[in-house]
Amino acid sequence: MAESNKMKEMPVNKLMIRMGIPMILSMALQAVYNIVDSAFVGNMRVGSEEALNALTLVFPVQMLMVAVGIGTGVGTNALLARTLGQGNGKKAAKVAGNSLFLGVIIYVVCLLFGIFGVKAYISSQTVDAEVLEMGVGYLRICCVISFGIIFFSLFEKLLQATGRSFYSTIGQVVGAVVNIILDPIMIYGIGPCPEMGVKGAAYATVIGQVASAVLLFIFHMKMNKEFEHGAKYMKPDGGIIKEIYAIGLPAIIAQALMSIMVYVMNLILKFNPSAQTAYGLFYKVQQFVLFLAFGLRDAITPIIAFAYGMRSKKRIQDGIKNGLIYTIILMILGIAITEIFPEAFATLFHTGASREYFIGAMRIISISFLFAGINVAYQGIYQALDGGVESLVISLLRQLVIILPLAGIFSVFVRNGQIGISLIWWAFPITEIVSCFVGYVFLKKIRKNRVNVLN
């Protein structure tokens, strides 16, 4: 069955499973790097608590680099696919070339930040000299050798634009495997490799990213024959760059909001480094669970968008219903695992002094997974039905407008000794529940104005 026929004729529930599983696995792999690093670092013989705190502080910048790379790739993907659909091979070559030019610019910015800005960034979140040293060492390596993650993100989208997403998945798997193998060797010093501690974790991460990028570069050059390759196509074209970011900028903003939220939460929790570490570790577990919802969202959006294009009210309604049902199932599974096994996760990270805070955060914040997953599904539905503004509003509510003021206010009571740190964790479920209510109102409005009017 041709791809367009599948989108048109295959039962929506079956189509969503078929499209969603690879995307869910792909998103889950993206979360593996950070969890693996933290697990091995948490089991260091000396300084593990400080090292985990350092990884918590550097995480927002890591997410921001990924956000810019993926956002640029998203814009490239959509523009390249459209251009190829129009049969314009010359412009397609320029689109691909300009995306690589943008990758070079992004890398130079990351490199300069790695050399000149890392220390000021880390010191804004901690006064602990050991944490500062570890954080600077780790983040400097990640920024200076960031070309791996940047170009992996671009080549991944170039392959997806030509229908070769299988090869990008291979690249992700290879990078994750390389990272997992190198982490204990470089962190603990196994064989001829010296013990490098937290810097070893950074080197293992970037080597895995470079391995993925190199492999995808080879796939791109050998498989993407629909357009020409060459340095001449990297000459910047203002019109093409504008088109790329007209599509990709919203994706960058949405991802960047996550970085801002984590950074500000680190500042709010600065008065208690153990709670700060616990939040950073839990966020990586939370990210892994929510990435399941993100992967399913990436299936929900094209299915509903295709149905909207063919003006099929039934397939749109089936897409909304099945998307929400499958998301709820995944999130209930995530809640069950995190509520039942918080001690197992604490042991995995060898949390030490932050163990109590970590378990408390997991038991409270994981309640929000159900509502957070529904919000993510809502955003996929909005985007499919031309509801970009509604999607952005939900992102702002979840990651900026509600959560940060609420956590800040709660932290005042905690610092004054009036109540325990758990009050701050309750800001997350409250935020997701309120956002979910607003999201439901948006969904009713969109269904009334854009779906129910269809024949």
State where each predicted segment sits.
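Short alpha-helical transmembrane segments in multi-pass integral membrane proteins
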Residues: 1-20, 80-147, 193-248, 304-368, ...
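N-terminal transmembrane alpha-helices
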Residues: 7-47, 60-75, 79, 104-111, ...
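Transmembrane helical elements of multi-pass membrane transporters/channels
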Residues: 18-37, 141, 175, 208-212, ...
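Transmembrane alpha-helix boundary and packing residues in multipass membrane permease domains
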Residues: 23, 27, 39, 78, ...
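Helix-terminus/linker motif at the lipid-water interface of multi-pass membrane proteins
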Residues: 28, 32-53, 122-129, 185-196, ...
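Small-residue hotspots at the loop-to-helix junctions and early N-terminal turns
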Residues: 49-60, 135, 139, 202, ...
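Small-residue-rich hydrophobic transmembrane alpha-helices
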Residues: 52-112, 149-168, 278-342, 372-386, ...
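Short runs within selected transmembrane alpha-helices of multi-pass transporters and secretion channels
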Residues: 73, 142-160, 168-176, 201-216, ...
